[in-house]
UniProtKB/Swiss-Prot annotation:
Record-stated family: Belongs to the purine/pyrimidine phosphoribosyltransferase family. PyrE subfamily.
Quaternary structure annotation from Swiss-Prot or TrEMBL: Homodimer.
Coiled coil region boundaries: none
Organism annotation: Sordaria macrospora
Taxonomic placement: Eukaryota, Fungi, Dikarya, Ascomycota, Pezizomycotina
Protein name, as recorded: Orotate phosphoribosyltransferase
Length: 232
């Protein structure tokens, strides 16, 4: 696999652990996908180690390349919460000198009106550079909501890291999927002017799944990419 080692390790763990499944899955877009990735299935300790390592190494790679600088790792409720906390812990393990004092925060779905109150749990966001960690970008709606919450608290969104870029074009308004179009990830990056990084792309999956999945699953995934791949 031409991808970096951590990407290959993450892909293998995802397939072996049943987090990345092959078959027939109806998406929110009503498309029938031959694969499905569910970051919520990283609930076993060894799988959590795999995903936290992948997030941390992707973040370090972006940071060292000068594309990303941040103070706080933020996990949007609900799936983003364990991802952000695990990634923060792994960053400190891998490079304590650089990331030992990095903080994390997450939001509540509903504001708390007693105790410490508010919408945010963890480090205060005001005046800080915030890195959002989440599973995927579909339509970008959830990310825009997270950005709005962070900005309301006075934080500055520095970047977004997701586990998977499906690289597929957004559904056409008129339902004609033969038309070219941008991906959700690129569309979100353009509309927000915030850099977005992905651990894996669909290209990575197809390149790396050979030998880990059946030839029929590889063929169906390649056909899906050919039909729905974004033109950005």
């Amino acid at each position: 696999m031409a991808a970096l080692r951590y990407k290959a390790d993450f892909l293998k763990a995802s397939i072996d652990g049943g987090v990345l499944k092959f078959g027939s899955f109806e998406l929110k877009s009503k498309r029938i996908s031959p694969y499905f990735f569910n970051a919520g299935d990283f609930y076993r300790a060894d799988l959590l180690q795999a995903i936290s390592t992948a997030y941390a190494k992707c973040i370090i790679e972006a940071h060292k390349s000068g594309q990303l600088d941040f103070d706080i790792v933020f996990g949007p409720a609900y799936k983003g919460i364990p991802l952000a906390t695990a990634a923060t812990d792994k960053l400190a393990q891998l490079d304590p000198e650089t990331y030992g004092k990095i903080c994390y925060s997450f939001d509540r779905k509903e504001a708390k009106d007693h105790g410490e109150g508010g919408n945010i749990v963890g480090a205060p966001l005001k005046g800080k550079r915030i890195l959002i960690v989440d599973d995927v970008i579909t339509a970008g709606t959830a990310k825009r909501e997270a950005i709005a919450k962070i900005e309301k608290e006075g934080g500055i969104v520095a970047g977004i890291v997701v586990a998977l870029d499906r690289m597929e074009k957004l559904p056409a308004a008129d339902g004609d999927d033969s038309k070219p179009g941008p991906s959700a990830m690129v569309s979100s990056a353009r509309s927000t002017a915030i850099p977005i990084f992905a651990i894996l792309t669909l290209d990575d999956i197809i390149e790396g799944m050979r030998g880990l999945a059946s030839p029929e699953d590889v063929k169906k995934t390649e056909e899906y990419r050919a039909k729905y791949k974004a033109t950005d």
